[in-house]
Amino acid sequence: MNIIEANVATPDARVAITIARFNNFINDSLLEGAIDALKRIGQVKDENITVVWVPGAYELPLAAGALAKTGKYDAVIALGTVIRGGTAHFEYVAGGASNGLAHVAQDSEIPVAFGVLTTESIEQAIERAGTKAGNKGAEAALTALEMINVLKAIKA
């Protein structure tokens, strides 16, 4: 039996992070967590990290797709926060972002890590951006790095 697993240390990785400005008071913490994980755990060099800001979570798939198509990056990390309100807007934005990012990953065949919080409240979002529930930005970064190495191992 063959088993493929990979670690997260990827010093030569070229990683793009696309991040939503909307809810930036939460997203800034996700970005800090992602960059810290890339550098400290993944050993990614600062010059190999590109950050692209977009207006909101709905725009993340378009930016991620454009970044993936350049061929310059080994992975894309998408960061944002969608908080449920009193209308159906939450479902459209959260669904559009998650489905769009999944399509980008499948079409480009590079890892697109989903670091978009979809929460019921601001409190839940804050918990997932570096307090009680860890930092989902850091988790997305580690996922991206591991998947870079998993795909390399599959293709080897």
Swiss-Prot record:
Alphabetically, the GO molecular function entries are: 6,7-dimethyl-8-ribityllumazine synthase activity
- The reply to whether Coiled coil figures as a keyword in the UniProt entry is no
Q: Which residues form the active site?
A: 89 (proton donor)
Listed pathway(s)? Cofactor biosynthesis; riboflavin biosynthesis; riboflavin from 2-hydroxy-3-oxobutyl phosphate and 5-amino-6-(D-ribitylamino)uracil: step 1/2
Known EC number: 2.5.1.78
Q: What are the record keywords, sorted?
A: Riboflavin biosynthesis, Transferase
Q: Does the keyword Transferase apply?
A: yes
Family matches, as Gene3D superfamilies: Lumazine/riboflavin synthase
What is the superkingdom listed in this entry's lineage? Bacteria
Where does the chain bind 5-amino-6-(D-ribitylamino)uracil?
22, 57-59, 81-83, 114
Instruction: From the UniProt record, list the reaction(s) this protein catalyses.
Output: (2S)-2-hydroxy-3-oxobutyl phosphate + 5-amino-6-(D-ribitylamino)uracil = 6,7-dimethyl-8-(1-D-ribityl)lumazine + phosphate + 2 H2O + H(+)
One GO location term (cellular component): cytoplasm
Residues given in the record as (2S)-2-hydroxy-3-oxobutyl phosphate binding sites: 86-87, 128
- Give the UniProt record's GO annotations in the biological process aspect: riboflavin biosynthetic process
Record's function text = Catalyzes the formation of 6,7-dimethyl-8-ribityllumazine by condensation of 5-amino-6-(D-ribitylamino)uracil with 3,4-dihydroxy-2-butanone 4-phosphate. This is the penultimate step in the biosynthesis of riboflavin.
> Quaternary state and partners of this protein?
Forms a hollow icosahedral capsid composed of 60 subunits, probably arranged as a dodecamer of pentamers. Unlike in B.subtilis, does not interact with riboflavin synthase, and the core of the icosahedral capsid is empty.
Q: Which family does it belong to?
A: Belongs to the DMRL synthase family.
Instruction: Please identify the protein, giving its name as recorded.
Output: 6,7-dimethyl-8-ribityllumazine synthase
Q: Which species is this UniProt entry from?
A: Escherichia coli (strain K12)
Q: Tell me the gene name.
A: ribE
